[in-house]
Structure formats: C-alpha cells, structure tokens
From Swiss-Prot:
Task of the protein: Required for the insertion and/or proper folding and/or complex formation of integral membrane proteins into the membrane. Involved in integration of membrane proteins that insert both dependently and independently of the Sec translocase complex, as well as at least some lipoproteins. Aids folding of multispanning membrane proteins.
Descriptive protein name: Membrane protein insertase YidC
GO cellular component, one term: plasma membrane
Membrane topology: Multi-pass membrane protein
Amino acid sequence: MDIKRTILIVALAIVTYVGVLKWNQDYGQAAMPTQNVAASTTAPGIPDTAAGTNGSASADVPSANATANTAAAPLETPAVASKDLIHVKTDVLDLAIDPVGGDVVQLRLPLYPRRQDRPDVPFQLFDNGGERTFLAQSGLTGTNGPDARAAGRPVYTSTQKTYQLADGQDTMVVDLKFSENGVNYIKRFTFKRGLYDLVMTYVVDNQSAQPWSGNLFAQLKRDASSDPSSTTATGTATYLGAALWTAAEPYKKVSMKDIDKGQVKETVQGGWVAWLQHYFVTAWIPDHNATNAVQTRKDSQGNYIIGFTSPTLSVAPGAQGETSATLYAGPKSQAVLKELSPGLELTVDYGFLWFIAQPIFWLLQHIHAILGNWGWSIIVLTMLIKGLFFPLSAASYKSMARMRAVAPKLALLKEQHGDDRQKMSQAMMELYKKEKINPLGGCLPILVQMPVFLSLYWVLLESVEMRQAPWILWITDLSIKDPFFILPIIMGATMFIQQRLNPTPPDPMQAKVMKMMPIIFTFFFLWFPAGLVLYWVVNNTLSIAQQAYITRKIEAATKKAAV
C-alpha cells in the first residue's frame, strides 16, 4: 500500500509541476524579444494596410464601430518630446499625458516600489519607448471625430504642465482643450484620492452650424517584452496577456499567441478590456449600458492592442454632448476590481480551482486583519486547513501505522516467495484482508486534499498582498525565494523525518527512490516563493506531529492486544 501511495504522491507532484509549466507555455510570459519602439503619438485600432497614405488619419485610430464604414486611414505623426508631457500626481498615481491625442504614456505606482531595496523607485506600469512600450490610448473617431481627421491627432492644451493632488484635496480634474471648425473639445481626467481608477470624459461643445457625430475609442497597447513584475524563477510565471468580458465568458483570456493568429472581435453590452501581468492589471471600462465593439490586433511595429469602440455620439448645433470611460491601472485588488465591473475581479487568476482559492484568500485576509503579518497569517491558515482535514489525515496515518505494524510479516512473505511476484501479491492481499488494512487507505485522503493545496499554491503565487511582504528575520519578501535557502532545507528535513515515520517499502529499488525524494524536493523548492515554502514547512511539521501521535497510539494498542 505504501508503495502505491508513494508512487501516487510522486506522480501527482510531477504531473502538477509539468502541467503548470505547460500552462505557462500557453498563457504565461511570451518568450519574445523586447520591442524598443520609439514614442508613438498615434491612437488605437484598425490594421495598418494604408500606412503610407498621404493626408490620412493616425495609423492606430479604429473605425467608428463594428458596423461603421468610416474607418480612418493611417498617418504616422511625429513623436512628442518628454518635456511636452503633462505630469499628474496623486497619492497613488504618478503619470504623464501626451498632449498629442491625450494618451496616458507613463504611469508609476508610488506605493509599490520596483525593488524592496529601492523604496524610492516606484514600479512603472506604463512606459512609452523606454524599457518597453505600454500605454493607454483614447480618442474620438468616426464622421467628425478629431482623431480621425486627415491632419492627424489633435494637439491639446492645458492651463498647467504639472498637476498634484494637494493635502486635504479628495478630487482633482485635469482638462485638456482643443477647438476646430466651431467645435470645442474638452478631454477631462478626474482623479480621486486613494483610487487607482480615473474617469476620462470627452465634452463636445458644438458651436458650429452642422450636427456633429463621433465615437469614443479606448485601448491598451503593449509590446512583446517580458513581465517586469514577475519574481519567480521556477518556470511558474503567471499569465501575461490580454483579457476581456463577454456575456458568455466573464473572463476571456486573449494571449499574444491568440492575437498573432488573427483579430478577435466581440460585440458586448458594457464589459471591459484589460492587460494582465503578475500582481498588476490595467483595464478600460466603458459605459455599462452601451453596446461596445471590442477588438484585438497586432500593429506593424509588433505591438499588441486590445480596445473598444463605443456607439455613435450625436451632438446638434449649439448643444453639448458627453461620453466617458474608466481607466484602472494598479494592483490586482479583488474587492476594488469587483466594484468597478462584473468579472474584473477574475483577473486575479487563481486558475481552474478559483472557486476554492477565493474562499481561501478571503480567510487569509481576515487572519491578516488580526495579525498584521502575512507570514504568521500563512502559518495560522495552514493550521486551520490542517485541522479541517485532520479526520482524513488521521485515516491515512492509521493506515500507514497498520502497514508499519505488519512490516515484519511482509518481510517474511518476501522471504517465503522470493521473486515470484504473483504469489507475493496474493499473499500480501490475504494479509491485508486478515489485518483489515485497506491498501488505498493512505491514498484517498491525499486525493481529496490536493485541490485545496493547489488552490493555496495559486493564492500565494498570485496575490499582490504577498509582494514585498516581510515575515521575520531574513525573510523580507514572501513572494520571492528564500535568499539563504534556509526554509527549503528545513522543508527537506521535515520530509526526511516524515519518511522515517512511514513503513519501509519491501522493494529495495522503491526504498532507494524514497530516500532520494527529500533531496529532489529540496532542490525544486530552492527557487519557490518563501511564502509557499513556509506553508509547506508548517504543513509537514503538523503532519509529523499528527502522524507520530497516531502511530504511537496504534502501536501501543497493538502491543496491549498482543499481551
């Protein structure tokens, strides 16, 4: 029985690890070279088929909507020097807006340092041509949209070049203005204290003699560079790619490979489009009541684009009209994302066991609210899970204890039957039946617990709360490997102790393989996040205590019965 249990554990570990690696090949970081593209002032959308056309609109501007026949033709407009950018700073966002088109081309997160040893250097989410190309674009296209005009994208003006949310100020509005042909445009950004989402609103004041019509578009544009927020070195990188919402599929991934194969087009009521990376997400969220055309594409420079175009906005002469969308750029906070739009919280990707992982994270959060330390919270959570599964674990340990008790009898059977495996198997089954031992008794409890353990793995790997979270002493970041490999070595030691408590396999080859397992697993765990290794150490330690207690209890009962 113990041999089967051992083989099952090893097989599950190997299959799980290989499965994770395969999942990352399909949905993880793209193994592509970084595209160091120069700063672009173009807006989102249609294919670059007319990229050389004279007197045409920007190459990135999409058609008005899925059914419109007024698609803009491309024109590359000159890049704007960084000195011309409009800088905006709140308590949680530090960003730059390009006056050409009004795109958000740089964005940093002051509360999230890029590295723990450099708390003064914030993590940079958007970057237009520095280390990578990643920006949020938006504009007005369609019949009269200024972003679809032959002269190129509009150049906005602002009253200031720098805006900062003052102490005691909860809301800040940044207005960019542009006028043409009797129509006055305001591109308004509204920021609020403590929020990573901002509202982008277009105000169209039509003072011309003609009716005005246009469509709002918004998109995220990114090159193929690797994930700058990824910290694992085990091959278990989380998903890097696009995602969107549909009524049939509230969380639909669109990987770079999917975009390489061709455009994805959807028509949705409300919805959202997003770009995901480890710990952080950026998303455009349109009007929930509007029917929006969502599409993805890859431009001629190798950039990946996902965006939407809203229904036509019509403004009569002498009237005003408004259209808006929300941009989120920040950490994967489930509570915040759920409030912004249905399904957006699923971008915290716990994999196919998300329905188990979410309650585990909820419990972990509540424990942290009491203890204030994520390391101790992991320990308490592990104890609670171990206690919950104690009846199942006890059944497994009892089965192993009985196997340990009959080990001398198994050795005697081996001497009697030698290399005759068939007779040996028959004799073993008769012995199990006589001693009332279930050969699968140690395996089934493990199978039941595996989904919970895998879910906890993804919770610890995916949750932004673990990023740069300290525990004690040398563990200053639970999301990266133990810098001195102390926890993995302790984990290997606990596996060795567990092995000593188990009955020795009758097959010498199996016994040799089992002796190697602590060394093999220690090697694997050297590069695992410290938070995950901490969980495994605590889990193994509790298992040793439970197993030792039950084994002593059964052995004492066996000796008493023998007397």
